[in-house]
Amino acid sequence: MRAETAGAGGGGCTGPGVADTAGPGPHPAMRRAFPGGGRATLGLIAPLESFSGDVPTMEGHLARVCAAEEAGFASFWLRDVPLLVPGQGDGGQLFDPWVYLGALATATSRITLGTASTVLPLRHPVHVAKAAASVDLLSGGRMLLGLAVGDRPGEVPAFGPAAADPADRLPDSWAYLRHLTGDAVTTGHSSPLGELAPGTGLVPEPAFGRLPLLMTGRGGRTIEWVAEHADGWLYSALAPEIQRANTARWRRLTGESGAPGSKPYAQAGYLVLDEDPRSAPRPLPQGWAMGREPLLDLFKTYEAGGVDQLMVNLRLNSRPADEVLAELAEYLLPHFPTPEIHPAARASHLTVRQF
């Protein structure tokens, strides 16, 4: 069965989606988040909140995401944190990512929505495919699926023996998910994770072409494996000289940014934006801490080094997140503009037909 959109969806914070301008070629979410050609964009990682402790309040969260969309940020990324593990100190964005993505798909209308990342080996590929295709359809083609094996080993035993070695499980999970969200969705698939009979397909079928699957980190794989199987690579914050070597190797395997068939490279980290715009950089594990002027210079260095998107997490700021977002929007976003790729018309109702 295949679900087809029929009519524009209900409005979001900036109004409903408009007529589809996607056409053939890359998925519309990829074109907006990663325009390529040496141009980087700015993305945000949930939660959009400055806080101390393990779990955010999530007060005013939808309004803040809407404000980020209005300002022109390219994408908003959610994390997959099912359990609060003692000593880990991180409850993610509190809400289940798929439930939250459903809310965001209707509350927003342009910003790309992604996971960074779904811990694929802890979820069955059929369920991940169903959820991602649903969000993509509801949002008008704005879904990017970042995948990882996870960095929280304390969670793994809660999922039973089948999840005991997430890195070993990744290739089978990835292949099954790719089959379900790709082009040949009715040919059948045989996997240690399940048997999909010929003629059995996902519903809704991906409505805007093959869903992009992005790798976070390496997942216990080689960079060659990532380059072959993923549609893009999300990596943690690196010093510019290390990042440049990383992206150079990636480009040798996948092609230059913006060229036909090339694959994007994004870099994610915590950002503490000082009130003094000239405040010098200081060390911050997995991130950056400084004023906006050296930050702009640093991000331009990353852009020149081949980074297609810089993804920032604001949770460690002592200043309110609204204030930090406003400063980024005024002083950094003009240097990293998001292309005007309109989403497809969202479904107000669905027409279902047989294969």
Annotated model-derived regions:
Residues 55-68, 131, 215-225, 290-302:
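Short, acidic/polar
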Residues 13-38, 164-207, 236-355:
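An alpha-helical appendage that flanks or caps ligand/catalytic pockets
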Residues 32-37, 69-70, 101-110, 132, ...:
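Acidic (Asp/Glu)-rich catalytic clusters
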Residues 39-56, 120-189, 237, 241:
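Flexible, glycine-rich active-site loops centered on histidine and acidic residues
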